[in-house]
């Protein structure tokens, strides 16, 4: 939090419902700063793909998660990132059914795009697993200092690409 405060940049983060309940100080600190906090399943180990054949069970996980989110943050979730990026073919429909605006599980593009659902469109905001904390710190064994350097480099690349885009 300190580095984001120092440079004055708002951030977004994902928090699963169980963490929101058990680690309230983290949620409060992010919420007090006005960060966008994405709903991230009820608990990390519970994958929506475990319920891919049972839409009601998947819906219940999403509803339970969104309920905790609203109670702890005092606002409705706008976006969703499934644990381990494991949504199902029903996830987008279930999210729009509950008023969510964006979904971050899809990694097939590096630009946001609209996804049609039964309840209207939802924005797919791309997720890069290449700069994921778990990937870099656990799977690849980088130190936290190396992780910070990688994130800074990624931001530099994104800024360069942004400057090359046509803005309407």
Please give the residue ranges for each predicted region.
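Catalytic alpha-helical scaffold of carbohydrate-active enzymes acting on polysaccharides/glycoconjugates
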Residues: 1-79, 84-124, 145-168
């Amino acid at each position: 939090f300190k580095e984001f405060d120092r440079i004055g940049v708002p951030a977004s983060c994902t928090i699963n419902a169980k963490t929101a309940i058990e680690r309230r100080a983290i949620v409060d600190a992010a919420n007090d700063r006005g960060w966008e906090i994405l709903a991230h399943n009820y608990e990390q180990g519970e994958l929506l793909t475990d319920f891919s054949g049972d839409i009601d069970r998947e819906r219940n996980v999403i509803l339970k998660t969104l309920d905790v989110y609203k109670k702890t943050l005092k606002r409705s979730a706008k976006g969703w990132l499934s644990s381990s990026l494991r949504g199902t073919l029903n996830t987008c429909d279930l999210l729009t059914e509950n008023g969510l605006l964006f979904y971050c599980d899809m990694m097939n593009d590096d630009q946001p795009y609209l996804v049609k659902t039964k309840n209207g469109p939802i924005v797919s905001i791309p997720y890069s697993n290449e700069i994921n904390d778990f990937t870099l710190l656990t799977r690849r064994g980088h130190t936290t200092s190396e992780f910070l350097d990688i994130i800074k480099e990624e931001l530099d690349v994104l800024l360069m690409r942004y400057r090359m885009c046509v803005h309407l």
